[in-house]
Structures are given as C-alpha cells and as structure tokens.
Amino acid sequence: MNKTTAETNQDIAYLLSNNLSRLLSEFSRDFERRIWQALDARGYPDIRPSHSAVFANLGLGAVRVTELAERAQVTQQAMGKMLKELERMGYVARDVDSDDKRAKEIRLTEPGIELVTDSLAVVDEVRGHYATKLGGMQELEKLEASLRDAVRKLELDYLPESWVDPQRG
C-alpha cells in the first residue's frame, strides 16, 4: 500500500520532532526552566540561564578567566561579559592571580556561595519532581547513569578529572 503525501509528511514531521537531539533538548529545556523559576521564587530574579556557564564550571576555588571560559566552552569575551554581570550583582569577585600578576582569578563571594547552595537545593527539588514522573528515584538515577556513560564513551568529558573522579584530585 502506497503512502499518501500527507502520510509521508506526517512521518517526516514525526521523525524530525522525535529524534535524540530534540528529546534531549526538550528535557534539558524543561529542567532548566524549572530551575530558573525556582531560583526566581527564592529571590534571584536577575540570574539567567547563561550564568550557569559560570556557576557550573567555577566550583568553590579561584579559577582564571581563561580556564573558566575553556571549561564552559565559550569565548573569553563571552565569559568576561557574564562575569561582569555577576560581579555587578555581587556573586563573584576578581582577584589578581598570586602566580601571575597579569592574570585575574574569579571566585565566589558569600552571596555567590549562598546562590550556589540554593541552586543545589533547587536541583534536588527538580530531580525529585522528575523522579516522581519517571517512576521513582531509581529510574531517574538509571537515566543519569546512562547519560554519564554515553558522555564518557563518546569522550565528551570536558571537566577537570578531579571533578569527574574525586579520587584523582
């Protein structure tokens, strides 16, 4: 039986909207939307999704701007713009690198540490929501483990090894 043009178009539309890239994007978009809404409700209305490139790659130590940009996979110019915004809001501070006086290091301020702490609590809340929807925490953890395994096998790891494996740092 031959398919009609409408059926073929419907098949193509389905395939375009239900591929791995789209599914991962939708999941990520929903996860991040829930996080930003919760942070806004907790008193962080100026924090934007782009700022996660800083917080997800900074940690609690001091990091040079160049390394931070590399970890976040953005240009130094883009990282500098985000850092200026976060510095103006009081979440990060720039210090002179003790090893190289020409370089600047970025560190979290006390309000920045509070924001990170609140962010971690929000992530736990969002994970709880997903666990409920997916059939329990064990199902969510299996999904996370599968994604981590895929990232490792595809050699997409870009974090410092000590962040990936605490035994190494």
Model-derived features: positions:
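C-terminal regulatory/oligomerization modules of transcriptional regulators
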Residues: M1-A13, M137-G169
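N-terminal leader segment of winged-helix/HTH proteins
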Residues: M1-D46
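Charged, amphipathic alpha-helical coiled-coil/dimerization segments
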Residues: T4-A6, K84-R148
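Alpha-helical linker/hinge and terminal dimerization helices associated
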Residues: L20, L24-F27, F31-A38, A72, ...
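Residue-level recognition of specific faces of alpha-helices
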Residues: L23, V54-N57, A78, M82-E85, ...
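N-terminal helix-turn-helix DNA-binding core of bacterial DNA-binding proteins
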Residues: R33-T75, V164
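Residues within helix-turn-helix
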Residues: V65-T66, Q77, K84, K104
